[in-house]
Amino acid sequence: MTVTMTLGQLAEALGATLKGPEALQITGLATLQEAGSGQLSFLANKQYRKFLESSQASAVLLKAEDAEGFAGNALIVADPYLAYARISHLFDPKPKAVAGIHPSAVVAEDAQVDTSASIGPFAVIESGARIGADVTIGAHCFIGARCVVGEGGWLAPRVTLYHDVIIGKRVVIQSGAVIGGEGFGFANEKGIWRKIAQIGGVTLGDDVEIGVNTAVDRGALSDTRIGDGVKLDNQIQIAHNVQVGDHTAMAACVGISGSTRIGKHCMIAGGVGMVGHIDVCDNVFVSGMTMVTRSITEPGGYSSGTAMQPLAEWRKSAARIRQLDEMSKRLQQLEKRVDTVTSGGQPTSEG
């Protein structure tokens, strides 16, 4: 499906200053390098400014300072990237769901499904579940007993909600995600692992987004909780009893161990691992592949590990790391000799 809007309509939708003809038709979005006739682009990062003058885009979202001297058509806004985010939904070709329950879906007699909801082929909705207004449940989804899916929720095909999962409004969950699976809880009896029943649930706030193949485990006793506006990328593991504060974002392959609490407005980069039973305060940034082994009590950026370097250099560095203990001992001996000299003693013949 092709969407066509005029430059004037887009300017009105964004509250942007228009530079160019109102009637110019825009049929899609693209990068500065790839845009062609009829497409709108944006300049959000200065490193791409070199592509601005040569871009074939019909118009560009620009800051006022970047629009000065630009000969092409523009929509002038305070934040081009945010403006792009807002209008991207206008050109999204994703098919619209049709209200109703597909004949192949299996819905329990006592489940409540709003008449405006869309239930896809072969979906299963178990006893006591409640599906709110304008919810989309994709093909082959499983909605367990007593689950609640709030108004405007969108579940892609093959999403699994175990029993007693509570989802707020406008939540998006991508394919393969499993919400409410059993937490990893076992007690050791003389070398034998005894399973602990996970009798809590999962609660997701409003406007949460969960990526492909991400798992959010149910709590052992109380619920695992994901706050409002939280964004979880693909292949993330959220263990039982974890608490994630409002508007925190995590990139792919993050692993959060059980009972850890993460504050609001945090950014957790890809591949980060956190041990269990720690607290992370609000407004923390953790760089990629960092291993968080203790609580973080001060806002700011945190990192561990080493950045990429040429292989030969890395091998030399690794070899030096193995020598640190011996080097430390030699340094301590040297410090003792320096102390002897500075305190009035005489250096040895070896010094």
Swiss-Prot record:
Q: Where is the active site?
A: H240
**Cellular component, GO annotation:** membrane
The pathway that the record names for this protein is: Bacterial outer membrane biogenesis; LPS lipid A biosynthesis
The record, for InterPro entries, names: Hexapep (IPR001451), Hexapep_transf_CS (IPR018357), LpxD (IPR007691), Trimer_LpxA-like_sf (IPR011004), UDP_GlcNAc_AcTrfase_non-rep (IPR020573)
Keyword presence, Acyltransferase: yes
Q: Which top-rank group of organisms is this from?
A: Bacteria
* Catalysed reactions, as listed in the record: a UDP-3-O-[(3R)-3-hydroxyacyl]-alpha-D-glucosamine + a (3R)-hydroxyacyl-[ACP] = a UDP-2-N,3-O-bis[(3R)-3-hydroxyacyl]-alpha-D-glucosamine + holo-[ACP] + H(+)
Q: E.C. number, please?
A: 2.3.1.191
> Which biological process annotations from GO are given for this protein?
lipid A biosynthetic process
| One function term, GO molecular function aspect | N-acyltransferase activity
Q: Does the keyword Glycoprotein apply?
A: no
Q: Which HAMAP family match?
A: LpxD
How does the record describe its quaternary structure?
A: Homotrimer.
Give the protein's biological function.
Catalyzes the N-acylation of UDP-3-O-acylglucosamine using 3-hydroxyacyl-ACP as the acyl donor. Is involved in the biosynthesis of lipid A, a phosphorylated glycolipid that anchors the lipopolysaccharide to the outer membrane of the cell.
Family, according to the entry, reads as follows:
Belongs to the transferase hexapeptide repeat family. LpxD subfamily.
Q: Which NCBIfam families match?
A: lipid_A_lpxD, PRK00892.1
**Know the name of this protein?**
UDP-3-O-acylglucosamine N-acyltransferase
Q: Which organism is it from?
A: Pseudomonas entomophila (strain L48)
